[in-house]
Amino acid sequence: MNWTTDKVRQTWLDYFAKKDHLVLASKSLIPINDPSLLWINSGVATLKDYFSARKTPPSKRLVNAQICLRVNDIENVGFTSRHQTLFEMLGNFSIGDYFKTEAIDFAFDLLVNYYQLDPKRFYITVYEDDETTYKRWIKHKIDKNHIIKCDKSRNFWDLGLGPCGPCTEIYYDRGEKFDPKKIGEKLFFEDIENDRYVEIWNIVFSQFNNDGNGNYTELAQKNIDTGAGIERLVSVLQNSPTNFDTDIFLKLIKIIEAFCPFKYDPNSYFTFDPQKVKEQSYFRIIADHFKAITFTISEGVLPGPNERNYVVRRLLRRALIACKKLQLNLAFIEKIIDEIIASYENYYQHLKAKNETVKQVVLKEINAFNKTIDLGLVLFEKSVKNNTLTPQLTFQLNETYGFPVEIIRELVNQKGLTIDWTVFDQLMAKHRSISKQNNQTINFEKQNINLVNFKTKSTFFYHKNKINAKVIGLFDENYLPVKELNNQSGYVVFDQTVLYATSGGQRYDEGSCINHSNNNDQKISFQGVFKGPNKQHFHYFLVGSFKLNDQVTLSHDETWRKLAANNHSLEHLLHAALQKEIDPLIKQSGAFKSAQKATIDFNLNRHLTRNELEKVENKIRSLIKQKISSKEIFTDFEGSQKLNAIAYFEEEYSQHEILRVIRFGDYSVELCGGTHVANTASIEDCFITDFYSLGAGRWRIEIISSNETINNYLKAENQKLIQLKSELEKVLSLIDSSIFKVELKELQQRLDKFILPEKITQLRDASDTLLALKNDINQLKTKNYKVSQQALALSIKKQLLSLVDENKSYVIATFNDVEPKLLLQTLHDVFNQNQTKNFLIINQFNESNSFIVIGNKTTTIIEKLRNSFNLKGGGNDKLFRGSFQDNVTPQKLNELFQNK
């Protein structure tokens, strides 16, 4: 059976739907109100509120296919068989419903009777004390020698506190060809990833509660959480050497091949040629990273210097370095993005509408990175010349200039230099820990006993820009309390601070401190500020020196704070305007605020019109012009309810004695811990830059504030309009004026009349005007193409007929860059008029020698060709289509068939 990725996914969803599971749509890659995650990285990540009982699930049985992103060890992508950044997780879940027996039965039934896998090739791991699971697998006649009992380290999920339980893993034996060294079974038993025994499914039984001291009690409500990576399952079903040799990846790699001088060979997996492996890895990196880039940008995460934005930038830069290694023509970019969207749009329907946006963002970032690469190389060459190359400088190439680690190592090796890579690796590890901590901001490692026990009081001042403070807590990067850190990374807590910590969807303040206890008044910048479990602000630094009781001066970046406050207050006004102007049932389901912009996510069963968005926008402008002062009210939960304050998490807020309410007149009243403007006039202006679907009835609005930000945005958008206008003029110049004279004149006049918007309020009309013109020009382009194709078909037909000779059995011809479909149709027409002849046609299309044979008993012709040339392809007795790997000319064919 031909198992495509789409078919594997749909089979999974259909199977569990028949078993009374509710099918959930894939959620956004960006976690909703979950600062513990930078990205959604598992199928269960979007369901945590159901498992924790914070929310009631829509059904006790759930199933999904969830898009995920993991970038914690990005350097491995492309060099291993199954490591990817973007992947899909298939999952079935039970929340207080079925348990071990049914979960195992479902897995066995689906794998054997639907995916048609051989149960004799199953290898199973179970927790050593879990006899129920062991016996259930035995009941399914799994060979006892294929079931291994493992200890807690392998088959027991436990975070140290809270729900936990055993798990069972299903592996599939792919055969000896994936185990040439005969060590696969040894690796499997030692829990080491290998290509023969591939894990395809993991079932976690949430059965116990850990009180934090290693005491386990049975849970009243037991749950099932399972996960199966779709790419792993597809590679098994397609018998592919690696995940990168499955259907979707191979489509992308085919596009890459068409634009570079190298070829990708799935069979190179079996050759163990180091140079070939390295070459093939670049294909994989490009395909994988462009998938991730397409999905992340389609969800509004643009390349940038911080957090999620930096991940996208790094992925793109790493992909571009691989492009350079393959001497890749960057014209492939639009093609590969089109193919990614085409491969996934049936299930991830939001992608199609973001096609042009993804392309524009990628191309803009490429132009910027090309300049950055040059600057980085100048810095590198200068340091080599001056003999000042250090681990710190090579680290700077990665952090500041975006050079992937493997490229940095190659640059150093090419110069025959040596540096202390241990120091470099330590700096890289510290840098990665920033992302790691951003992933863990929810209660900042709530389970860590050192942080839980740290209860020294610290005060945050909302309305001060600078403050003198004392160091009251120091922790290394592993959260171990220390008395001193010297030029190291770690976390520092002050008795008072003015730096806002990431929370409530608002990013931490940019800021720094001057440590007066150091002889040189060392300035130390902070790469993150996070709330600990006892609400203190932990300031993360990459390199710095502190001792307990050091005296410092703390300050935040006032411009950053002002813009972030603008956008946070703007988000409150936007939320209120959506409720009052559109639908009172709209409720924010996620938000993000920084100095650059604000976003709000909400549920609604329909698309908002442009008029509705502008109505909301104009209402906010009115509130800005009214110069409404903000009011900060401290009260308890009951008091906040009397004020009708909006609270996103009532069960959480109700546990706090004192709450902070931010009020803008009678229009907006919300519980909030973020920074805000004193008066709406500070916001200056607003503009909605984007509105799009996140799927499943969820929508996102992106909005910006301040005159400077909006003016810069208008300039950037005008550059896009200028570029589009230039592209449209080029299209018009290629249309045949002798045929479409009237249409060309009318379209050119419209294009000449187009004027760039001078005000932000004119931007949408200008964009709509040019897009409408683009649509009309493309329609004319299509007409022109059809006419040109008709003319080309007529020309080809005349050429073929001129070659027909009643004394010859074969008509042999060659063409350049003719669309295969057009050539085949024309060839059929000519053959129908000359059915005693055999037509052998070479077409040099997309840098390959495609070949068509139409005639009588083509199998005899093809057999003769195969004996003489390296020919690939297939067909029947009347038609053959394929390609030559050799340089085959009409002269050689005439000689072979004695067509004289």
Swiss-Prot record:
Keyword Thylakoid: no
GO CC annotations on file: cytosol
Catalytic activity: tRNA(Ala) + L-alanine + ATP = L-alanyl-tRNA(Ala) + AMP + diphosphate
Keyword match Endoplasmic reticulum: no
Domain description: Consists of three domains; the N-terminal catalytic domain, the editing domain and the C-terminal C-Ala domain. The editing domain removes incorrectly charged amino acids, while the C-Ala domain, along with tRNA(Ala), serves as a bridge to cooperatively bring together the editing and aminoacylation centers thus stimulating deacylation of misacylated tRNAs.
NCBIfam families, per the entry: alaS (TIGR00344)
The name this protein goes by in its record: Alanine--tRNA ligase
Lineage: Bacteria, Bacillati, Mycoplasmatota, Mycoplasmoidales, Mycoplasmoidaceae
Gene: alaS
